[in-house]
Amino acid sequence: ISRLILQMPGYMYAYSDDKIYVSHYGGSKTTIPLENGKVMLEQTSEYPYESDIKIVLQPEKENKFKLAMRIPTWASSNEFAPGGLYPYKKETTEKAIIKVNNEEVAYTMDKGFAVIERKWKKNDLVELHLPMQARLVKSIPEVTENEGKSAFTRGPLVYCAEEIDNKVSIKELTLGNIDESQAQITSIEEGILKGIQRIDLPNIKLVPYYTWCNRGDNRSMAVWIND
């Protein structure tokens, strides 16, 4: 993982003669040498916690080229990840929205990227909004271990229930008739996880899976919870 983190800057952007690819989201700045001139990009984002990404483009001169922004599977289909293993429990028609200089624009999808082609000028602002509500995920029947269970995700993050938050044995937790529309996103106010976004349900609290096992000795946790 430490090696991957150091390599991330090299994975965020790619380009061809007349096309810039934005493959990952996060605060960053880079300069791309396109065939017709250099373009500086500055990206600001709280992804993966927030759904909005902003990119300011600074071409050396007015320049026509394509900007391709990756739209993750979880934001563009009715499954959490590619492969068909983990479909969402409820389908949605929400799609990614892209604005240029505060006006919504049309885009075409090409191999997972939303592509905009236009003549760009200095200080053009691109805003990408990804649908990032809490979603219930199921497994396909072949994953027998997860039969009769569901999990919650939000954006690219998988969530889990820890016993320290729920005050009962993890084995006793059930989702029952909980609907994803009942999920409330709150920010943890204190402790080592201060600022982390939590999913609050009527009877269950969930934290991002990567934060598991950071609060005391009680390490009981579940991603897949009984329906």
Regions found by a protein language model. Give the residues of each.
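Short acidic, flexible loop segments centered on an aromatic residue
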Residues: 70-74
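C-terminal beta-rich recognition modules with glycine/proline-rich loops and embedded aromatic residues
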Residues: 1-58, 76-100, 105-109, 113-121, ...
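Extended extracellular/luminal ectodomain segments enriched in beta-structured repeat modules
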Residues: 60-67
